[in-house]
Amino acid sequence: MTRYKKVIAQNKKALFNYFIEERLEAGIVLKGSEVQSLRQGKASIEESYAGDTGHELFLYNCHIAEYEKANKFNHATRRPRKLLLHTKEMKKIIGKIKIKGYTLVALSMYFNKKNKVKVELGLAKGKKLYDKRESIKEKDWQRDQSRLIRQK
């Protein structure tokens, strides 16, 4: 069964900089002007991550551009946004984040089938420099293989 996703923003750097061990979907609390701006595709999650404050998770450094037609009722572009998860999921993830070396990174932001904005989060562990080099070599080898197959 395929799921409908209208992708707003993706964090391709996260897949290069981190080992993604677990993925999860979370809702996000937004203001009206933020939703309108997202419908226009004006968002960036390149540097965004999730952190906990007590028993809640927030998304930090997510840039959603101001909506031009919202005038004085506009939002702050980089404000912390609350993430919506079930309590059991949240406790489990917060426990894993507290382990040294793990972080919760935003991988993509999209509209689901019901036109709700969702954020795909990844429980990630940072890659070392030699790991990054290895992944670059692997991508180059895959690219060369596909070229050789096409030439034959």
From Swiss-Prot:
Domain of life assignment: Bacteria
GO biological-process terms attached to the record: trans-translation
GO cellular component, one term: cytosol
InterPro entries: SmpB (IPR023620), SsrA-bd_prot (IPR000037), SsrA-bd_prot_CS (IPR020081)
Keywords, comma-separated and alphabetical: Cytoplasm, RNA-binding
Cell compartments where the protein resides: Cytoplasm
GO molecular function: RNA binding
Family membership noted in the UniProt record: Belongs to the SmpB family.
Function summary: Required for rescue of stalled ribosomes mediated by trans-translation. Binds to transfer-messenger RNA (tmRNA), required for stable association of tmRNA with ribosomes. tmRNA and SmpB together mimic tRNA shape, replacing the anticodon stem-loop with SmpB. tmRNA is encoded by the ssrA gene; the 2 termini fold to resemble tRNA(Ala) and it encodes a 'tag peptide', a short internal open reading frame. During trans-translation Ala-aminoacylated tmRNA acts like a tRNA, entering the A-site of stalled ribosomes, displacing the stalled mRNA.
NCBIfam families given in the database record: PRK05422.1, smpB
Protein name (database record): SsrA-binding protein
Taxonomy of the source species: Bacteria, Pseudomonadati, Pseudomonadota, Alphaproteobacteria, Rickettsiales
Gene: smpB
